[in-house]
Amino acid sequence: MALQSVLVTDTNIWIDLENGGILTEVFGLPYQFLTPDFAIRELVRPKWQLLQALGLQSQELEPALIQELTHLRAANRALSATDLAAFLIARALDATLLTGDWRLNDLAAKNGLRVHGVLWLLDEMVRFRAIAPEHAANALNQMLSQGARLPQDEYRKRLAGWST
């Protein structure tokens, strides 16, 4: 059974959301947000304590998955242990993976996981009226000005649609 209301996140997503000024608003979505317990020490901006207070939950890897993480890490050196832990948790829960890392996105897609990024999350925030379209456009512009690397065609399409 797929846990479609559960989103397993990497750390990049939270940085983009903070840069966009919409960290609080994302928790207005009807999703449960999980991140690997490995990520706690990486979440210094935004701080783990803030994210936890807003609703982000940490998820431990099952012991059997820790061994698999070691093998995955050897085969995917460009990905961090935290990124691979997010992948393994999403796969184990049959949940959706949210990532800002194209390498992790590729790995997830090749393994049949549902995977999305911050643009999808912005779409969901507009769809569920957690933010207005104009607010989404402003947040996206802030993310881009802070160095977010997003598919140009995709973000331009959204900016055009949300700014009208």
Language-model features: locations:
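Hydrophobic alpha-helical interaction segments
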Residues: 117, 121-163
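Active-site-proximal, substrate-binding regions of enzyme catalytic domains
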Residues: 2-95, 102, 113, 140, ...
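Short, ordered loop/turn segments at secondary-structure junctions
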Residues: 102-103, 120
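A short alpha->loop->secondary-structure connector
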Residues: 110-116
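Glycine/proline-rich loop-helix segments at beta-alpha junctions forming the active-site rim
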Residues: 107
